[in-house]
């Protein structure tokens, strides 16, 4: 995996939270970006469970697909109160100028006593958004509004 085997790392940002996610494949960078985002909200190491939600989305480009993917997971957390810890992207494809993702996120019901809340994320932003293929895989830079 790129960057010495790291899945993600957090970077300095004045007001919000910025992270880089890495992956050998495009699917893996989407999975690791989701993990990085949820580790801002809670400690995913304390989450288990196999409550699953399927996510299928279509967007005009890969960068928008990444933002839509993370935003949908954030929405599911807020509405269904599920904390996710495992992400499996089954497919990302381009067809007729649009990109789509089919994935499954797994986790468990959110209980404040079991999952201490660390940071509230208001939104996933396009600010400083980057998604690029590198010599050794893929890299995504994401800023979330807190």
Curated annotation (Swiss-Prot):
Alphabetical GO biological process terms: tRNA splicing, via endonucleolytic cleavage and ligation
Keyword Zinc: no
Keyword Calcium: yes
InterPro entries: Archease, Archease_arc, Archease_dom, Archease_dom_sf
Amino-acid positions noted as binding Ca(2+) in the UniProt annotation, renumbered to this chain: 16, 145-146
The entry's keywords: Calcium, Metal-binding, tRNA processing
SUPFAM superfamilies (alphabetical): MTH1598-like
Known role: Activates the tRNA-splicing ligase complex by facilitating the enzymatic turnover of catalytic subunit RtcB. Acts by promoting the guanylylation of RtcB, a key intermediate step in tRNA ligation. Can also alter the NTP specificity of RtcB such that ATP, dGTP or ITP is used efficiently.
UniProt family annotation: Belongs to the archease family.
Protein's name according to its UniProt entry: Protein archease
Species name: Methanosarcina acetivorans (strain ATCC 35395 / DSM 2834 / JCM 12185 / C2A)
Organism ancestry: Archaea, Methanobacteriati, Methanobacteriota, Stenosarchaea group, Methanomicrobia
């Amino acid at each position: 995996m790129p960057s010495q085997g790291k899945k993600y790392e957090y970077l300095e940002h004045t007001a919000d939270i910025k992270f880089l996610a890495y992956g050998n494949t495009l699917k893996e960078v989407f999975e690791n970006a989701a993990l990085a985002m949820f580790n801002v909200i809670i400690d995913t190491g304390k989450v288990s469970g196999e409550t699953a939600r399927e996510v299928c989305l279509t967007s005009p480009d890969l960068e928008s697909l990444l933002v839509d993917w993370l935003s949908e997971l954030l929405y599911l957390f807020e509405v269904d109160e599920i904390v996710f810890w495992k992400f499996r992207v089954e497919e990302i494809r381009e067809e007729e100028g649009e990109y789509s993702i089919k994935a499954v996120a797994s986790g468990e019901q959110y209980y404040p006593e079991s999952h201490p809340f660390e940071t509230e994320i208001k939104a996933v932003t396009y600010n400083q958004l980057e998604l690029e293929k590198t010599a050794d895989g893929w890299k995504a830079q994401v800023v979330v509004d807190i």
